[in-house]
A protein has these predicted regions:
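Cross-family detector of peptidyl-prolyl cis-trans isomerase
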Residues: 3-6, 19-231
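Bacterial Sec-type N-terminal signal peptides, specifically the leucine/valine-rich hydrophobic h-region
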Residues: 13-16
């Protein structure tokens, strides 16, 4: 996991209200371009400390430190002396989340592999062909045009070309191993669901902020075409 890149910037977002000496009098508006930009800054910076998985009580403490820092109040602790402890907490919680996701993924894959009509590859991918295609099968070196939707095992969608309304085109050997192997089992015009073990997806690092460490992933894929290189 990357070292914390330091909290002077990362903490600066959890509560705009906490930065003010006055209590908030009305809901925060996010309508103008400037308001949207500063709101986005908050979201982006909060993602940098997502690994802490703060409890409500811890969030109050962070907000207190944030408000004191913004308002130039004297800190009640030595922030520099707390760096090592914060790093220790972040790493421990990151590992705990990874271990939990790994165990849940193993259970999910085991259950999925026992369903009727699926195939489990030697590498551990569980594939269900929901519509048989009639065209050619791609090779790993081919570019493919696909529609897809990716979900965590709790059903949360983290990426979807379907929602964007635009198919994706990419080299099949330039994506996660689960895709490289799984899509090669499909024919053009076909649809399939791929259940990807973490080691064939984004592994122990995940893909922050949308994919946690050691996450088993589910993809619904439609193979639209094999794209020929431009001459």
């Amino acid at each position: 996991m990357k070292k914390l890149n330091w909290l002077a910037a990362a903490l600066c977002t959890l509560s705009f209200a906490a930065c003010s000496k006055e209590p908030a009098q009305k809901p925060v508006e996010v309508t103008t371009d400037d308001q949207k930009a500063f709101y986005s800054l908050g979201v982006l910076m909060s993602q940098q400390i997502e690994s802490f998985t703060l409890t409500p009580e811890e969030l109050v403490l962070v907000q207190k430190g944030l408000a004191d820092g913004i308002n130039k109040a004297k800190p009640v602790t030595d922030p520099e002396a707390s760096k090592a402890k914060l790093q220790e907490i972040a790493q421990a919680r990151f590992k705990a989340a990874a271990d939990k996701a790994s165990a849940a993924g193993v259970e999910f894959l085991d259950k999925a592999s026992k369903e009727t009509g699926v195939v489990k590859t030697e590498s551990g991918i569980v594939i269900r062909h929901t519509k048989e295609g009639t065209g050619a099968k791609p090779a790993a070196t081919d570019q493919v045009k696909v529609h897809y939707e990716g979900r965590l095992i709790d059903g949360k969608v983290f990426d979807s070309s379907i929602q964007r309304g635009e198919p994706a085109t990419f080299p099949l050997n330039g994506v996660i191993p689960c895709w490289t192997e799984g899509v090669q089992t499909m024919k053009v015009g076909g649809k399939a669901q791929l259940v990807c073990p973490a080691n064939l997806a984004y592994g122990p690092n995940g893909s922050p902020p949308t994919i946690p460490p050691q996450a088993t992933l589910v993809f619904d894929v439609e193979l639209i075409d094999i794209v020929k290189p431009a001459k």
